[in-house]
Amino acid sequence: MVDNLTHLKQLEAESIHIIREVAAEFDNPVMLYSIGKDSAVMLHLARKAFFPGKLPFPVMHVDTQWKFQEMYRFRDKMVEEMGLELITHVNPEGVAQGINPFTHGSSKHTDIMKTQGLKQALDKHGFDAAFGGARRDEEKSRAKERVYSFRDSKHRWDPKNQRPELWNIYNGKVNKGESIRVFPLSNWTELDIWQYIYLEGIPIVPLYFAAEREVIEKNGTLIMIDDERILEHLSDEEKARIVKKKVRFRTLGCYPLTGAVESEAETLTDIIQEMLLTRTSERQGRVIDHDGAGSMEDKKRQGYF
């Protein structure tokens, strides 16, 4: 029967199986919602998995307070339209310290507001499994991670201590205090994601589509002027270099750490055509991926998603 399914339908069936398996195996799962395209697809698959019922778990957004304003508006709209149970968590210690990507740099900002914030939220609510939208084709450390990614009592990942996954059989047994991160989209590619969004009519943040936007080039990266806070950290000379360009985003994160790409892709079909021709990674614009050699793996070892 599998042979009769299209490539995307096979991926869909695999992801739905994983989501249902986790819901059946674990006591208190949660779905992380970063508001990006992969989260949109994962949420769509989860709703399909349990239709016509509601999701048997909440969705959670670990908020750094530096996402694009359009992302916040989109999140609130989706939560209202879908009737989701949303948990938001902001690291109170980071807020008290005034942590931001300009003053403290991308590495410290990411560690405190994302990694430590995520660990706080998981501990606070006692979640034993957390769904995430990471894919193996995104980055080399993610390429070697299992669908069920086991974490110790401090949420750390040990790439040398992973369980074998045979076909579609997943071992979810964990000791007290341990947990897993689950990646239902592990075998999807960026092109698969876009084709599925197109076929299923999944709503996404408009930032993925090309439009005239104010940007400034910093260290070879086009940073969008999303709100007034960024202007406080620019010199007069830098402010003079702010220009309007037709750009879009292939990946979304904290706006001062996420680079735009010049593009003419205004529709989903345009984006798919662009994906067929591009030879660069979608994460080339993520500043946190360039903090140092092996930086993503180091972050994941400390509990980053």
UniProtKB/Swiss-Prot annotation:
Q: What class of enzyme is it?
A: transferase
UniProt-listed CDD domains: Sulfate_adenylyltransferase_2
Keyword entries, A-Z: ATP-binding, Nucleotide-binding, Nucleotidyltransferase, Transferase
**What does the protein in this record do?**
With CysN forms the ATP sulfurylase (ATPS) that catalyzes the adenylation of sulfate producing adenosine 5'-phosphosulfate (APS) and diphosphate, the first enzymatic step in sulfur assimilation pathway. APS synthesis involves the formation of a high-energy phosphoric-sulfuric acid anhydride bond driven by GTP hydrolysis by CysN coupled to ATP hydrolysis by CysD.
The annotated subunit structure for this chain is: Heterodimer composed of CysD, the smaller subunit, and CysN.
As for family, the record states: Belongs to the PAPS reductase family. CysD subfamily.
State what protein this is by name: Sulfate adenylyltransferase subunit 2
Which organism is the protein's source? Answer: Pseudomonas entomophila (strain L48)
